[in-house]
């Protein structure tokens, strides 16, 4: 079956072109994406405040000065029983706050990404789609699989020195796309298949998104703290159980996290571009060959129209037709069982 030109073009893109396509997708679809994703960000802020304000207030009320205690420990000064109990309680509460915060954040952000992933992928592939129907179709029973793996297992694994979390993220983040594809029977396996070989690209995409938001947020907060930051007494009055004002706390946190809200669509747009290109390459399989271009000493030819056959035995005097590696395009004069340039096996071509 003839592959569409859009899929071939997507498969041909370099990583730099993929990133540029992601930014282009962000700019073209920002108006449609910002409303649903901003709503999810605000929901995240509200849930975080209602779930953790009491715990944060209690932790602050313990009056534990961590810096002072650490200084005592460094000076080999024995802590009193009261100080030790307060420190233990403070650390346990802090860990609990961090875990709950990460859990809520991962679940809400996962749902947010799922809600627009199908729309973005179809827009990128220039298929007919609209945000309302795509948003509705995102909420099916398979979404619980994504929430469990990305929204729950990911924050749980963060407490295991981050390594399992990185592995889960790099291997299965494409599940936010594959779970909602009608032609995919095993979305986890499909997500892993497409992500295979793209682990570092996925991590680089995440880090790039993090750096951009971090820089813009830092500039914004430096201005925010100068003009809009309330006094500590006023803010504590909002938090205090006796005078708590949830409305002011929510408004304050929305303003403080405004950059995260406004740039919420960026990561899913970058990820969509990477997913589409990776999926195109995997779907085309060994039929895919890049357009003629040089990469150092390797030249990638245009796609061949005839099948490639590797004879198992050839006499020395027999002329052998040259062919190109279907993986890297390297010109091979003598048939081999593997590519001398990239090392890929050719055994499957004779199966």
Predicted segments — roles?
Residues 56-91:
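Membrane-interface interhelical loops and short interface/amphipathic helices
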Residues 35-56, 94-110, 145-169, 205-234, ...:
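Hydrophobic alpha-helical transmembrane segments in multi-pass membrane proteins
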Residues 2-4, 9, 63-71, 118, ...:
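Juxtamembrane transition segments at transmembrane-helix termini in multipass membrane proteins
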Residues 11-43, 132-157, 170-217, 245-249:
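Interfacial aromatic "cap" segments that immediately flank transmembrane helices
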Residues 111-139:
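Hydrophobic transmembrane alpha-helix segments characteristic of membrane transport
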Residues 79-82, 86-95, 99, 135-153:
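A conserved helix-loop-strand patch within extracytoplasmic ligand-binding domains
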Residues 8-11, 165:
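Alpha-helix initiation/capping motif
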């Amino acid at each position: 079956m003839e592959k569409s030109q859009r899929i071939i073009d997507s498969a041909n893109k370099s990583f730099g072109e993929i990133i540029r396509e992601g930014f282009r997708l962000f700019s073209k679809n920002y108006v449609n994406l910002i409303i649903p994703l901003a709503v999810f960000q605000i929901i995240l802020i509200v849930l975080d405040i209602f779930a953790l304000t009491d715990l944060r207030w209690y932790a602050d009320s313990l009056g534990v000065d961590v810096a002072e205690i650490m200084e005592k420990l460094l000076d080999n000064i024995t802590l009193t029983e009261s100080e030790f109990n307060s420190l233990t309680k403070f650390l346990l509460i802090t860990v609990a706050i961090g875990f709950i915060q990460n859990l809520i954040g991962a679940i809400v952000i996962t749902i947010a990404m799922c809600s627009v992933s199908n729309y973005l992928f179809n827009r990128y592939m220039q298929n007919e789609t609209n945000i309302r129907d795509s948003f509705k179709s995102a909420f099916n029973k398979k979404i619980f699989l994504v929430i469990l793996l990305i929204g729950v297992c990911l924050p749980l694994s963060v407490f295991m020195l981050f390594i399992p979390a990185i592995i889960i993220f790099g291997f299965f983040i494409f599940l936010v796309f594959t779970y909602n594809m009608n032609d995919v029977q095993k979305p986890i396996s499909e997500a892993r298949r497409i992500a295979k070989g793209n682990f570092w690209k996925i991590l680089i995409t995440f880090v790039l998104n993090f750096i951009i938001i971090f820089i813009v947020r830092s500039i914004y907060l430096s201005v925010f703290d100068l003009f809009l930051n309330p006094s500590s007494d006023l803010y504590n009055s909002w938090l205090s159980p006796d005078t708590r004002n949830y409305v002011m706390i929510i408004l304050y946190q929305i303003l403080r996290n405004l950059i995260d809200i406004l740039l919420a669509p960026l990561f899913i747009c970058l990820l969509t571009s990477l997913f589409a290109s990776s999926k195109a390459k995997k779907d085309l399989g060994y039929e895919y060959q890049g357009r003629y271009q040089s990469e150092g000493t390797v030249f990638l030819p245009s796609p061949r129209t005839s099948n490639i056959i590797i004879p198992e035995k050839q006499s020395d005097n027999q002329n052998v037709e040259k062919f190109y590696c279907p993986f890297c395009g390297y010109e091979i004069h003598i048939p081999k069982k593997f590519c001398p340039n990239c090392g890929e096996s050719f055994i499957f071509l004779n199966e």
